[in-house]
């Protein structure tokens, strides 16, 4: 069929999924902004650590995407399942490790920014701890998304992630401002709304996966991983993860510098970064689609189709 048409069909839902992720953060900022710039600064500061967590997510995410795409191209579904199993095992271990670090070292981590205002510091710590408790959902959803994208079914994760966004949009005003019987939780409410929405996404992914026997049957997640596939996943994902981690690290240093002028500059930086994300999320959507498309054709040894679409 038409390569351009196939690429756009794959890319548009992936781009949509990227924008859904951005909309999560924007929704939080809109409702938290009603409390004041101090609350936005607290959420923005703690949010750097979830952003840094993306570097960990990218290792099994890229590994799953490429490994599944190439296996599907070769029509080797058993090999695809091996990549799926290893990527899920890896993301669960990384989530537990990173969440433990964030909870144990929460005070020095937030202290890095030299915020100066005790209320902002306490709110940032509260947000960080609540998010850390649900970090496994935040980590595993992009890997499920990558598995479906690698399989060539990008519409499914877009729809599932959209359910999470709608859940978050409903819960944010209820939990942040306190509507009806719910207490006003402010910053804690924003964190709770986010992890509940992410948990809903994980549950829907698991239900969907149960019906996708060609991808998820007999995975045996508790079996020991083999080093060959683990190394390949790390080799595929580490360069992108390192780039993401360095980018976030620089942003954190900038935030530390501007924090000396108070909470408003931090809030402005956080909101500005969300708007800036529109440009690179568009490119990221096409990049992910190309990775899946090239991976499937590489696996199928359809070299001519690779060069045509590049």
Language model features with spans:
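Helix-loop-helix hairpin linking two adjacent transmembrane segments in secondary transporters
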Residues: 107, 133-141, 145, 149, ...
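Residue-level signal for transmembrane alpha-helical positions in Major Facilitator Superfamily
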Residues: 8, 12, 23-24, 60, ...
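Membrane-embedded alpha-helical segments of multi-pass transporters/permeases
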Residues: 26, 30, 56-59, 90, ...
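Signature of the first transmembrane helix
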Residues: 5-65, 69, 238-258
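Helix-terminus/linker motif at the lipid-water interface of multi-pass membrane proteins
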Residues: 19, 23-41, 110-118, 174-185, ...
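Residue-level recognition of pore/gate-forming positions within transmembrane alpha-helices
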Residues: 14, 18, 22, 48-51, ...
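Short alpha-helical transmembrane segments in multi-pass integral membrane proteins
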Residues: 1-11, 68-136, 182-238, 294-310
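Small-residue-rich hydrophobic transmembrane alpha-helices
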Residues: 40-100, 138-157, 250, 255, ...
């Amino acid at each position: 069929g038409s390569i351009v048409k196939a690429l756009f069909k794959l890319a548009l839902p992936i781009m949509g999924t990227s924008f859904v992720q951005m909309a999560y953060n924007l929704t939080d900022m809109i409702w938290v902004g009603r409390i004041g710039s101090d609350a936005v600064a607290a959420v923005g500061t703690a949010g750097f650590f979830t952003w840094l967590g993306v570097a960990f997510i990218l290792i099994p995410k890229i590994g799953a995407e490429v490994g599944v795409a190439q296996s599907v191209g070769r029509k080797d579904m058993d090999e695809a399942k091996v990549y799926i199993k290893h990527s899920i095992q890896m993301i669960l271990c990384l989530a537990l490790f990173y969440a433990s670090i964030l909870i144990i070292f929460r005070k020095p981590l937030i202290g890095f920014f030299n915020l100066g205002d005790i209320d902002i510091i306490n709110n940032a710590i509260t947000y960080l701890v609540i998010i850390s408790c649900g970090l496994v959902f935040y980590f595993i959803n992009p890997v499920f998304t990558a598995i479906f994208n690698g399989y060539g079914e990008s519409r499914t994760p877009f729809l599932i992630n959209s359910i999470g966004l709608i859940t978050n949009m409903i819960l944010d005003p209820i939990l942040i401002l306190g509507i009806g019987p719910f207490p006003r939780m402010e910053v804690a409410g924003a964190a709770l709304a986010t992890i509940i929405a992410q948990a809903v996404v994980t549950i829907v992914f698991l239900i969907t996966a149960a019906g996708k026997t060609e991808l998820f049957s007999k995975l045996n997640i508790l079996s020991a991983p083999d080093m060959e596939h683990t190394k390949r996943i790390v080799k595929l994902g580490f360069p992108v993860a390192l780039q993401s981690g360095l980018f976030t690290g620089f942003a954190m240093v900038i935030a530390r510098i501007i924090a000396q002028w108070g909470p408003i500059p931090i809030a402005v930086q956080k909101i500005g970064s969300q708007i800036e994300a529109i440009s690179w999320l568009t490119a990221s959507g096409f990049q992910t689609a190309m990775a899946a498309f090239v991976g499937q054709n590489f696996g199928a040894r359809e070299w001519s189709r690779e060069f045509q679409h590049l």
